[in-house]
């Protein structure tokens, strides 16, 4: 057909700013995304640059602007939907070969960075500040407050942190949005009722008194490593946050008084600041924030920590503070100033500011990294839960292309080659400095979740990437960029991450007993004191080892077969009585059940020969909606049972369920057809699928967005369906 006859269609993310948010919007035409080896840097360019350097399709898409594409033909066959979806998604590949996006959701990550930057005297660009304001005003609740994550009920923590952030960014206290927020905050008990995490940030800012929070003594860092009390045995994120918080608590560090801080002291409380009984606030935690009432053991721990502050030994305190500083320095050094995540990045930057000063390479290096977790979403700018998802999303995308037979096509050669190049440069080639002293897991050979600079080994990211690389490099058209030795090194690292009790965790094997959770005084989250066993990580390892041992049958075959058997044994034990598995990183039962059934397929278990798989299929089929799709609510993670999404069927949940059923060789072919048909109906004329409910989880019960999940898991589901059952006409206009 002549070019002039090609019918174009307009697409967009469908976002409209709230009236308050629109006041702070920047000129979206001037935003550009710079990338380098997975690193993201959104930059607001001058007008003349904007005129000469056109925005890419990916920039347009993520900014939520309208774009024009050739109209795709209405899919009749499953292959049509697969081709249309891939044609759209491949356009989102960045110049360095990866697929990137935001993984935002928690509403205290950006505010922590903004507060820390303010204290350290770091000036953020005006465009960045305005877009941060726009983001928050787009996500404000109807009552004027903010919750723990986007679209969650207002809490004292969320409202205080984001009110404070908006004031720092320049929004006046008389702004209608802040008047509403303050009214809601006072109704919930004011900032006096902050949970410990919020009290910490307000203390560091000088808008709360250290006497008002449960002490965070750094002395556990001096405990022998074999004792569970030593933070080296805690979950890696909890450990990193605790170390920096305990350092700042031990020094009673607070920012110098400024007019703004004085104003916040007046605005955040329901009584004059100087009249507050700060010691009485230690146990004053709002019911809007508490996940559970405190146990007697937790109350006893809090009392013991308070008593210890009166009898502490000065020598031990100094030694503990030195150790805390050493740990933070190790973390900042080993991650090229990034830290494991933006949450601990913010508090670690304050530690470096206190210990070394604003002009030190520590603070300057971290200041240069503030941009890394920031993403220009369609609602504005916010920090993600990590410095991106670059390796994870790219490996999953390559796998989707392989599952659908797309990677083999000549027209996709360059796309796959660039992805392989990115994956190759992203492998971690050395261990962190001071592995044992810094409580680190070896990393040589691993692939990280985000970028090589971040430098944390993750079991499932490494497993998914190894599998994708082996299959991609098996294509005749692909060069062998990742050597056999490097793949073997990655598998050796995975083998070393197995838990003694079977199964896999994410960052490191279990180090502490689950009884540590009894001492959880975060008030906000469940199951955050130690690492956990995850069906999704365990299944990813199974899929990886199955692929690896077929390609390299002589590399540690006995060990690999033993590990695969133990992983399968763990999955069978981890199944819930309802028939599903519960995820910790995605929503929720459908996500984990997808992975579990894929993992069990590698050891020959399916619906026809396994009661475990039969029960899982029955579980998934039970929750298929009348329209053919699946839709699970994030609240399932908290309730520990499947909860239907009130918004109805979701693209991601439908893809998860289909992947699981296909892997189990489910005999209910009609259910599979109806699921694929629903995905085809949900596809837009551009080939894309639109955003839906939150796709991910950080820690129970908090939600996150993983916007690429609706693409690569959906493409994998359709591709695997075609591979298993063949292509067929599934969607007719009259249906």
UniProtKB/Swiss-Prot annotation:
Gene3D superfamilies: 1.50.10.20, 6.20.120.20. It is an enzyme of class 5 (isomerase). GO terms for cellular component: lipid droplet. The active site is at residue 460. InterPro entries: SQ_cyclase_C (IPR032696), SQ_cyclase_N (IPR032697), Squalene_cyclase (IPR018333), Terpenoid_cyclase/PrenylTrfase (IPR008930). Its EC number is 5.4.99.32. Keywords: Isomerase, Lipid biosynthesis, Lipid metabolism, Repeat, Steroid biosynthesis, Virulence. It comes from the Eukaryota. The keyword Magnesium does not apply. Belongs to the terpene cyclase/mutase family. Protostadienol synthase which cyclizes (3S)-oxidosqualene to (17Z)-protosta-17(20),24-dien-3-beta-ol (protostadienol), the biosynthetic precursor of helvolic acid, a secondary metabolite which promotes virulence. This is Protostadienol synthase A. It comes from Arthroderma gypseum (strain ATCC MYA-4604 / CBS 118893).
């Amino acid at each position: 057909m002549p070019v002039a006859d090609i019918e174009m269609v307009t697409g967009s993310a469908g976002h409209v700013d709230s009236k308050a948010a629109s006041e702070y919007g920047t000129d979206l035409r001037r935003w550009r995304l710079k990338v380098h080896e997975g690193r993201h840097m959104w930059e607001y360019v001058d007008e003349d640059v904007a005129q000469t350097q056109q925005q890419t399709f990916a920039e347009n898409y993520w900014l939520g602007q309208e774009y024009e594409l050739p109209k795709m033909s209405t899919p009749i066959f499953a292959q049509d939907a697969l081709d249309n979806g891939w044609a759209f998604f491949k356009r989102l590949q960045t110049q360095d070969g990866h697929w990137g996006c935001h993984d935002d959701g928690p509403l205290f990550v950006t505010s922590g960075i903004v507060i820390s930057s303010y204290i350290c005297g770091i000036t953020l660009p005006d465009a960045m500040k305005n877009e941060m304001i726009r983001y928050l005003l787009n996500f404000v609740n109807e009552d004027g407050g903010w919750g723990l994550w986007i679209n969650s009920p207002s809490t004292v923590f969320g409202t205080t942190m984001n009110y404070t952030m908006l004031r720092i960014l320049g929004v006046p206290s008389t702004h209608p949005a802040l008047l509403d927020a303050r009214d809601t905050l006072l109704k919930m008990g004011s900032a006096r009722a902050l949970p410990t995490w919020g009290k910490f940030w307000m203390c560091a800012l000088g808008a709360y008194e250290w006497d008002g929070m449960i002490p965070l003594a750094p002395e556990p860092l001096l405990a022998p490593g074999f004792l569970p009390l030593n933070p080296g045995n805690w979950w890696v994120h909890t450990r990193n946050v605790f170390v920096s918080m305990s350092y700042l608590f031990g020094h009673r560090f607070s920012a110098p008084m400024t007019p703004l801080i004085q104003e916040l002291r007046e605005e955040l409380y329901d009584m004059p600041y100087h009249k507050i009984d700060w010691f009485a606030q230690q146990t004053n935690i709002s019911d809007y924030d508490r996940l559970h009432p405190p146990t007697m053991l937790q109350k006893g721990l809090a009392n013991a920590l308070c008593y210890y502050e009166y009898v502490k030994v000065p020598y031990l305190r100094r030694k503990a503070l030195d150790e805390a500083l050493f740990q933070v320095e190790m973390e900042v050094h080993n991650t090229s100033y990034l830290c494991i995540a933006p949450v601990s990045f913010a508090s670690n930057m304050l530690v470096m500011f206190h210990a070394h000063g604003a002009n030190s390479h520590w603070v300057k290096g971290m200041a240069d990294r503030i941009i890394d977790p920031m993403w220009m979403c369609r609602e504005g700018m916010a920090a993600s839960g990590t410095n991106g998802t670059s390796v994870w999303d790219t490996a999953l995308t390559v796998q989707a292309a392989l599952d659908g037979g797309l990677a083999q096509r000549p027209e996709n050669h360059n796309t796959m080659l660039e992805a392989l190049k990115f994956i190759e440069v992203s492998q971690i080639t050395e261990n962190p400095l001071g592995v044992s002293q810094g409580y680190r897991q070896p990393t040589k050979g691993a692939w990280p979740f985000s970028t090589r600079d971040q430098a944390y080994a993750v079991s499932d990211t490494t497993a998914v990437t190894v599998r994708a690389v082996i299959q991609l490099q098996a294509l005749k058209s692909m060069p062998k960029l990742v050597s056999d030795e490097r793949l073997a090194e990655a598998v050796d690292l995975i083998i070393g991450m197995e838990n003694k009790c079977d199964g896999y965790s994410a960052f490191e094997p279990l180090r502490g007993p689950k009884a540590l959770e009894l001492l959880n005084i975060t008030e906000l989250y469940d199951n955050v004191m130690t690492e956990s066993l995850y069906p999704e990580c365990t299944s990813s390892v199974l899929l990886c080892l199955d692929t690896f041992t077929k390609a390299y049958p002589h590399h540690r075959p006995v060990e690999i077969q033993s590990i695969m058997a133990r992983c399968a044994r763990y999955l069978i034990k981890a199944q819930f009585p309802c028939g599903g598995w519960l995820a910790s990183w995605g929503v929720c039962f459908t996500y984990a059940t997808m992975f579990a059934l894929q993992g069990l397929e590698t050891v020959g278990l399916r619906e026809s020969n396994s009661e475990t798989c039969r029960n899982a299929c029955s579980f998934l089929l039970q929750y298929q909606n009348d329209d053919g799709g699946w839709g699970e609510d994030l609240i399932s993670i908290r309730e520990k049972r499947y909860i239907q999404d009130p918004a109805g069927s979701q693209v991601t949940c439908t893809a998860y369920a289909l992947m699981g059923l296909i892997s189990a060789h489910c005999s209910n072919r009609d259910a599979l057809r109806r699921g694929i048909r629903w995905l085809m109906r949900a596809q837009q004329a551009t080939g894309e699928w639109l955003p839906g409910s939150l796709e991910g989880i950080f820690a129970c019960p908090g939600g996150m967005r993983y916007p690429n999940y609706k693409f690569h898991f959906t493409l994998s589901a359709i591709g695997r369906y075609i591979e298993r059952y063949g292509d067929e006409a599934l969607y007719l206009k009259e249906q």
